[in-house]
Amino acid sequence: MILINGDCIEQMQKLIDDGVQVDSVVTDPPYELGFMGRSWDSTGIAFQKETWELAYKLLKPGGHLLAFSASRNYHRMAVAIEDVGFEIRDQMMWLYGSGFPKSMNVGKAFDKKLGNERKVVGMTNQQDIRSGNYVGKATDTKEYSRIDVPITEGNSEWEGWGTALKPAHEPIVMARKPLSEKSIVDNVLKHGTGAINIDECRIEGNDAKYPDTNPDFKDIGRQSKEAIGIDKLSFGQTENAKRKKVVRKPRNESGVWTDGNSGMKAEGTQYADADPKGRFPANIMHDGSDVVQDIFPDTKAGSYKGDGSKSGGIWNKSTGKPAGREYGDEGSAARYFYCPKTSKSERNNSTVKNNHPTVKPQKLMQYLCRMVTPKGGIVLDMFMGSGSTGMAAKDEGFDFIGIEKEKEYFKIAEARIESVEVKATLQEFME
């Protein structure tokens, strides 16, 4: 594990000169919004081709890059990444409910300019944005002070107009360095990169692991009990479970789709074997907040409630059991990876107080590292900040190279990463 305090352009070039190669890049660069007047958030480095060209050179062929950005200027970073040779594979979304709309009240501004009096119609208790935390970064809401603010109403024709929407997502570019070999298989065999770790990022759900609570399943328990005297579902056995599958009309003889067989025309339903490993990972993640869950109104509580806040709703392959479940699974937010916002204890889980304003949840970064990094691989984060990616990589058993220019944040990152205990493998434990 290598932690470097220095300029990322200079330090990445040194790593290239030393022949270093990494398996993945998972990073949260400056959003170039001039956030809170911080100089490091207005340098333009996230939009520079040179930044991503160096990352490109450090990556093995087929290696993936995951980089966060802001919704309003994501395109500039994505274009810079693509222009240096990366293939844009997808755009992921991190949804959260803690965003605060930085919108001007146009009606109020009009009344102030014209000297109109506004009528106080009530009071509200809201977060004090002057407390210095960035609401759109999923930090613990308990850290915000709250103040009473009067609700006023004016007579301007522009009453109710504003200038901005409530921020509720951060896009993540998923890019891949082109393969050096003719196929994915050959590239993986040679470099260990090029593929995505689907099974280790599957999302638990009723359709496979809890067929007894899923209305789409046949009554396997009753049928098995009648046949062999044992209710298989009572033991959580799902090898005979079936899920409902819509049968689509096939193409015509020439293999051409028509209005009559477009795939939207269903002939009926059949029952297919359920996948016990869980749902296929999607390009949406969320913080599990009520605001986000309300977007998916079909959320229905399941019969089992585990410690989902620690697992992120991920299927635990090593035990064959869910790592924890807090949602049902009927067309709801449960279909997507979730982890709670960065808590105060997580921010300050070392001997150094963490005052970095844009801390990502460690579990979110673990999920991303796990998705694109092969076993024993090296993760690079050239915008290390307070070290969440480093903590995630270490916790997942990956090696890590982190670069951070700001001395203050570098010391915080060192302490936070040091606080993560390395999990011993079974072989190491036996030895």
Kindly label every feature range from the protein language model.
Residues 1-431:
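Core catalytic lobe of class I
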